[in-house]
């Protein structure tokens, strides 16, 4: 199996948490799927189990969101977390939208992700755009978690690829 990454996001009203998984398929496209959605209080245990079963190369969370509460709980369980900054969140959104527009992203027609995409609105962030999480009528956590999982996969691929280093 190819390397996988996870992204996690707790909804603005804290009623749900979404965990998305991203990987690169043999044809070169990135695939992303919401693999769990449930009560935020259960998320650390679920993510720990996913970490043990799927052996991800990275897990991405925005610590400046409702998801900040996941960071310490995941660390306690030994799950490493990449904490995204504002620029990372903006890049995650832009790259995700570019992959969608170019047909290089595979998703799985999941109703919760489709609803989030249809209800999505952009907001300015770090000189670019990101998802508006607060003033929309539908839970954006599946969309945001998916963006973060894809972002983490692309960053891992950049740093793990062999290259020429100047010393």
Where are these regions (language model features)?
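RNase H-like, metal-dependent nuclease domains and their acidic two-metal-ion catalytic environment used
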Residues: 1-86, 90, 94, 107-167
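Short, surface-exposed amphipathic charged segments that create phosphate/polyanion-binding patches used
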Residues: 94-103
């Amino acid at each position: 199996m190819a390397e996988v990454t996870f992204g996690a996001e707790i909804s603005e009203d804290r009623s749900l948490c979404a965990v998305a998984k991203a990987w690169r398929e043999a044809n070169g496209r990135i695939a992303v799927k919401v693999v769990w959605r449930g009560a935020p209080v259960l998320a650390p245990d679920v993510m720990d189990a996913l970490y043990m079963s799927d052996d991800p190369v990275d897990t991405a969370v925005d610590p400046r969101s409702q998801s900040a509460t996941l960071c310490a709980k995941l660390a306690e369980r030994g799950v490493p977390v990449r904490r995204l900054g504002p620029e990372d969140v903006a890049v995650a959104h832009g790259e995700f939208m570019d992959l969608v527009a170019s047909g290089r992203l595979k998703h799985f027609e999941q109703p919760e992700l489709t609803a989030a995409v249809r209800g999505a609105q952009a907001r300015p962030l770090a000189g670019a755009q990101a998802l508006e999480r607060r003033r929309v009528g539908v839970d954006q956590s599946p969309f945001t978690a998916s963006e973060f999982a894809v972002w983490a996969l692309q960053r891992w691929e950049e740093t793990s690829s062999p290259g020429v280093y100047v010393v």
